[in-house]
Amino acid sequence: MASSLCASSAIAAISSPSFLGGKKLRLKKKLTVPAVSRPDASVRAVAADPDRPIWFPGSTPPEWLDGSLPGDFGFDPLGLSSDPDSLKWNVQAEIVHCRWAMLGAAGIFIPEFLTKIGILNTPSWYTAGEQEYFTDKTTLFVVELILIGWAEGRRWADIIKPGSVNTDPVFPNNKLTGTDVGYPGGLWFDPLGWGSGSPAKLKELRTKEIKNGRLAMLAVMGAWFQHIYTGTGPIDNLFAHLADPGHATIFAAFTPK
């Protein structure tokens, strides 16, 4: 399962108060659904806090965002998650995007930094696809498509029917029990057993994951735009700014030379 942080409160969990006339009344009926249709049952056991942090102080969060979901700061100005099924999907979509973004951010910043200080010698993340590897790009793409497709297919099946993929396809005796959708746990995904704590502690850890994931999504997007306008990576830009903070700034990219 690129959270949303300095930015965490700004991009908090996808969900929203509807400010379009008539929409709110129409959606109230849709909210009368059993609680089991909402994801992360074990986390939702924590009662909603009326004094919980809100993305904008003084604002009223929508009914479908009661604070029981990790990373929920009552932000959904377009009502994208007003429908229970949409909320369920958006929760899982955000989790997986957060995790990919965190991996992506690590893949951008760490190799570039280690190359900058002379420990590694790797190409820029922006041009990594142009390099020659142990086989051709078509083979790499097909293998990646098969592996990722298999993993995403099982994730999709778990969303549709929670618990349906808890049995190891290779070793049927290995089974997971009591896991929430998007949080498989077990030896591979929770080797330290952090997911076995109290509901309050579990929600705290999941909220931290969402926040870091949202920050990572912003960081990856920032690195992308930065390379478009400067032609260099974030670490190179950082070192250049530290060496000449008066001139090496974001504004220099838009200044005619």
From Swiss-Prot:
Protein name: Photosystem I chlorophyll a/b-binding protein 2, chloroplastic
Binding site for chlorophyll a 5: 208, 226
Bound cofactor: record note: Binds at least 14 chlorophylls (8 Chl-a and 6 Chl-b) and carotenoids such as lutein and neoxanthin.
Annotated chlorophyll a 1 binding sites: 75, 81, 94, 214
Family: Belongs to the light-harvesting chlorophyll a/b-binding (LHC) protein family.
Protein's organism: Arabidopsis thaliana (Mouse-ear cress)
Free-text note on domains in this protein's UniProt record: The N-terminus of the protein extends into the stroma where it is involved with adhesion of granal membranes and post-translational modifications; both are believed to mediate the distribution of excitation energy between photosystems I and II.
The organism's taxonomic lineage, starting at the top: Eukaryota, Viridiplantae, Streptophyta, Embryophyta, Tracheophyta
Binding site for chlorophyll b 4: 155
Residue stretches spanning the membrane: 100-120, 133-153, 215-235
Coiled coil stretches, renumbered: none
Function: The light-harvesting complex (LHC) functions as a light receptor, it captures and delivers excitation energy to photosystems with which it is closely associated, here photosystem I.
MF annotations from Gene Ontology: chlorophyll binding; metal ion binding; protein domain specific binding
Binding site for chlorophyll a 4: 212
